[in-house]
């Protein structure tokens, strides 16, 4: 169903997520949150329900189990983009004269540089970090202790056969437009 696609909305929060949250149903019950769409099954909704319930408090993210790199906007703070990295998924920032870019891989930021003719200072965000960005700068940095799940090794950002090539081709097409 369409509600299972990103971006995902929960109340005032809308976001995107790379990874898998394994305790999503438990968290929705704990926070007395009904799914926005009754037939929705996407695990990412739990991240945004927690963010909505806690007003994007870093400590609340410790309740999430699984792999996570996520970005969201909260209508109560519309000028701020929140970026969070738990475990198992990478999150990269690229700072340039035109602002801050984020992606799951350094390679994606390099594609942005190449096709948008930018120079970015790239860095990987540390696990257990919540960033609040506004007007091209980091407004706040908060730390949290993400829960480790069964496999503590980072999952590859690209997993499906041909996914890398497909993603790069789509990025190049978007950049050329």
Residue ranges and their predicted role:
Residues 1-177:
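Conserved short alpha-helical segments that host acidic/polar catalytic motifs at enzyme active sites
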């Amino acid at each position: 169903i369409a509600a299972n696609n990103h971006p995902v909305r929960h109340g005032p929060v809308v976001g995107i997520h790379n990874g898998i949250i394994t305790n999503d149903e438990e968290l929705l019950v704990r926070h007395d949150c009904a799914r926005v769409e009754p037939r929705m099954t996407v695990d990412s909704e739990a991240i945004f329900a927690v963010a909505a319930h806690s007003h994007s408090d870093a400590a609340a993210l410790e309740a999430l189990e699984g792999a996570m790199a996520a970005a969201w906007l909260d209508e109560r703070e519309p000028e701020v983009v929140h970026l969070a990295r738990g475990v198992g998924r990478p999150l990269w920032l690229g700072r340039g004269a035109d602002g801050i870019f984020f992606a799951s891989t350094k390679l994606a930021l390099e594609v942005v540089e190449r096709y948008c003719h930018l120079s970015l200072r790239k860095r990987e965000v540390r696990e257990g970090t919540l960033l609040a960005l506004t007007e091209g700068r980091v407004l706040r940095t908060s730390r949290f202790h993400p829960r480790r799940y069964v496999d503590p090794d980072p999952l590859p950002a690209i997993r499906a056969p041909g996914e890398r090539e497909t993603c790069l081709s789509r990025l190049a097409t978007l950049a050329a437009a």
